[in-house]
């Protein structure tokens, strides 16, 4: 972060005329087609970043691909543009180009843009770039998620990013699952949910099943839903049976719904017993529906 900031002091984003942008893009496109790398000196990179503000989408794509092929050397100028350019098109394209590069050196600047830039496309592209960076982005994304000023739009973007990261390296969420903050634990579970549905990764399943015993009822309730969506009766039914006796109404309800979802016919007797002991009429109604549905199988 320090290295990028120190370099940014000498960076000044140029501007290109329509003719200059077209001429440069044509030359860059030819280099790319021949498998050649563009010049990576400061002046050349500066001109390419300036080209990201062109109103012609095809030209912007050529500049982005060229900067992406340069890689790490382009990060300082792209980060400067992302932070300080008054041209929203350049900020958007800079975030998208940092996504192409996918280097964690850009992470502090992407976090800042995600939190402070008011443009939704910049926020979305910054989140996408963090998702591409992967595991190093998990902690800052979860931190933002727990802040009171995190918007509903940002929450959606973060959940998408975390889900993508989870699909690539689910065990990177180990520390998040053990966080002291229940909101972070829930976010980590949701990020693992899709991965659990797509594969039979025993380590991922173990993390989710262990969350059924979490001290926070909201975490247990969320884990119960995920188990129902991602596991069969042999893998998760017995653990859900314990939650039919949970002290929290929502947890008991979710456990019954998940047993129905996984078609756990081995759970009919457990649901019968839970129905007889249930004092909440709404929860009892859900349990009865779940039992009756299972009896049809």
Swiss-Prot record:
Alphabetically ordered keywords of this record: Antenna complex, Phycobilisome
GO MF term set: oxidoreductase activity
InterPro entries cross-referenced by the UniProt entry: ARM-like, ARM-type_fold, PBS_lyase_HEAT
Pfam family, one: HEAT_2
GO cellular component: phycobilisome
Keyword check for Phosphoprotein: no
Family statement: Belongs to the CpcE/RpcE/PecE family.
Purpose of the protein: An enzyme involved in the biosynthesis of bilin.
Official protein name in the record: Bilin biosynthesis protein MpeU
Lineage: Bacteria, Bacillati, Cyanobacteriota, Cyanophyceae, Synechococcales
